[in-house]
């Protein structure tokens, strides 16, 4: 058996450099060049001290001008900007959840969308107090979808899923006025507070930032995750591959990109059909390969084993291969640059959502009622485009790694049951994992999430942090582009156990798992919150006592700020490798790195030096162990 070997970041970079050579031949632009054109960045923006929320400005804070025209100081301006950043992210993730609710409402027997996990639907219905006895599963699905949609605008009460928290934690959030109410209310309240002439008190702005994030994580995102499982199946371990080498030169290559599984699931369904495969062969291809970029890739990887072509900063690379017949996108994290870039090649750049329309794209509006018809048309368009390839521009880097993905909370519990003595011990709990942590076999866990960011060497922070954590017997649960970085490197191959400390290696062998567990897309960080809550309840602890931390070393988007706020709001210390534009306010820095502890039991740590960042995470995990006496 050959020795296991990681793919290095240097190898990623060599592959990209070769693709950029192809791009140069056709005059293509790429993010590497645009970054240079935008450097150096605006220092006022980086510090968060630029205000443009009214037409008396824009105002920027300097030692000579410490207040804006209205009198707001740096602390208020930075706080308002942070809150607006959060609101943008919470609205985006929660709108994803809303779309999934609408799709569930359209589900029907024999229709485009069907209920794949009726047991989970019934379980959530009972959790919400919805009667299930004697109901047709689709009648129940429609009732649950409508009930879920009411969570966005209900006039009273808090998010239903907050009841999943350990006893006392929900009450603490209510007491500190950060328990999320209606999802749309928290977004609207945030924008109201950040309006000219409203809040400029940093403490109030940070509290609402956490509350708004919590509406995302324990509201919109959690519904997006749970109802996607109902519609498309709850993920379980499945083997796949990752990196650009998953594209096949002899096949029609369709790349799905974005975040909404309603689109990608249907594309995969039709690309797998005999009719479309036969049609592809009729135009000279050997078959059809669907691969993915970003979170929609994570969605279809963990349910179907569809290979992952790459993460956020590789979206241009799939076009630069010259072998991509169509890149089909839905919403979020889509470069407008894909339009002009695709025109340099034969690639069809197809947008499908009225929420994400860009120039130089072909727009095919996708909706639940016509999903099958839309998907079939898109797959056929890609096949018809195969003949337009320019062979001299085709180059697919032969980099790929094996990955085992699909570790939902349910799948993790099932894995734990497999190493439990069912004659003696209780099954269906997280207690075996707690025993590993208590005994010190595993020191703790890191939830590694987030994006790529050109400010940091792409993928390097994710991969290096993970390598050091697993070497120190700290298990990683990963989602989003962080998960794809791990998969591309090989850290989701079960053979990566050889990179672990002795304790974690033994656990990986016994449970037959990789040391980095793929939990899904960015909305699926809600799975991590559910897992943390289950660990706390099974141990009798509060979440903030667990030797668990969160980390987003290369975060980039507004969604990441919302995520960070709900992870902190849940009680999990969160470590960032990129400053969240608050350095211009000492009060905001203090509140986010220490002040939030009195409300949630957790706070942020920001450290741009990756070596120092991982040491701080390990140190925090060990501090928590010491406090527990383990």
Set out the residue ranges of the language-model regions.
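Anaerobic metallocofactor- and corrinoid-dependent redox/one-carbon enzyme cores
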Residues: 2-630
């Amino acid at each position: 058996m050959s020795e296991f070997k990681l793919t290095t970041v240097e190898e990623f970079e060599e592959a990209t450099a070769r693709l950029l050579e192809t791009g140069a031949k056709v005059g293509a632009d790429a993010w590497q060049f645009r970054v240079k054109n935008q450097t150096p960045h605006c220092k006022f923006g980086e510090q968060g001290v630029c205000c443009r929320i009214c037409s008396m400005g824009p105002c920027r804070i300097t030692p000579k001008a410490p207040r804006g025209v209205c009198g707001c100081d740096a602390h208020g301006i930075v706080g308002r900007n942070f809150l607006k950043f959060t609101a943008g992210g919470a609205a985006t993730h929660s709108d994803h959840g809303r779309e999934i609710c609408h799709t569930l409402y359209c589900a029907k027997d024999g229709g485009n969308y069907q209920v794949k996990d009726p047991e989970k639907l019934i379980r959530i219905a009972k959790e919400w107090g919805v009667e299930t006895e004697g109901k047709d599963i689709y009648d129940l699905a429609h009732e649950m979808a409508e009930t879920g949609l009411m969570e966005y605008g209900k006039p009273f009460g808090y998010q239903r899923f907050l009841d999943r928290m350990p006893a006392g934690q929900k009450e603490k959030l209510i007491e500190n006025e950060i328990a999320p109410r209606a999802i749309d209310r928290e977004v609207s309240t945030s924008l109201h507070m950040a309006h000219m002439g409203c809040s400029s008190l940093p403490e109030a702005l940070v509290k609402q930032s956490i509350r708004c994030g919590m509406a995302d994580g324990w509201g919109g995102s959690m519904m997006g995750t749970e109802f996607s499982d109902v519609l498309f199946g709850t993920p379980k371990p499945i083997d796949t591959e990752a990196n650009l080498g998953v594209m096949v030169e002899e096949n029609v290559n369709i790349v799905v990109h974005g975040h909404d599984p309603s689109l990608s699931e249907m594309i995969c369904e039709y690309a797998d059909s005999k009719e479309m495969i036969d049609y592809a062969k009729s135009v000279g291809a050997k078959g059809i390969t669907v691969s993915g970029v970003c979170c929609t890739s994570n969605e279809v990887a963990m349910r179907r084993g569809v290979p992952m072509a790459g993460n956020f900063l590789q979206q241009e690379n799939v076009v630069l291969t010259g072998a991509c017949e169509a890149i089909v996108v839905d919403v979020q994290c889509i470069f407008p640059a894909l339009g002009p870039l695709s025109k340099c090649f034969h690639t069809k750049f197809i947008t499908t959502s009225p929420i994400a329309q860009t120039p130089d794209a072909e727009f095919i509006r996708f909706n639940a009622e016509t999903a099958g018809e839309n998907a079939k048309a898109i797959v056929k368009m890609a096949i018809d485009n195969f003949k337009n390839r320019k062979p001299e521009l085709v180059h697919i880097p032969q980099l790929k790694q094996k990955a085992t993905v699909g570790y939902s909370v349910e799948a993790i519990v099932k894995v734990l049951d497999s190493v439990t003595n069912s004659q003696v011990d209780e099954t269906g709990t997280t207690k075996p994992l707690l025993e590993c942590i208590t005994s010190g076999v595993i020191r703790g866990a890191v939830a590694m999430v987030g994006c790529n960011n050109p400010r940091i060497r792409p993928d390097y922070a994710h991969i290096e942090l993970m390598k050091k954590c697993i070497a120190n017997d700290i298990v990683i649960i990963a989602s989003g582009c962080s998960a794809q970085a791990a998969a591309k490197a090989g850290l989701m191959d079960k053979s990566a156990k050889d990179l672990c400390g002795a304790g974690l290696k033994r656990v990986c062998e016994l449970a037959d798992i990789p040391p980095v567990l793929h939990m899904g897309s960015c909305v699926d960080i809600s799975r991590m919150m559910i897992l943390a809550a289950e660990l706390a309840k099974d141990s009798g602890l509060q979440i903030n006592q667990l030797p668990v931390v969160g980390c987003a070393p290369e975060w980039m988007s507004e969604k990441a700020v919302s995520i960070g706020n709900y992870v902190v709001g849940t009680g999990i210390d969160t470590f960032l490798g990129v400053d969240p534009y608050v350095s211009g306010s000492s009060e905001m820095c203090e509140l986010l790195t220490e002040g939030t502890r009195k409300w949630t039991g957790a706070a942020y740590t920001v450290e741009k030096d990756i070596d120092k960042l991982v040491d701080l995470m390990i140190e925090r995990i060990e501090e928590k162990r010491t406090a527990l006496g383990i």
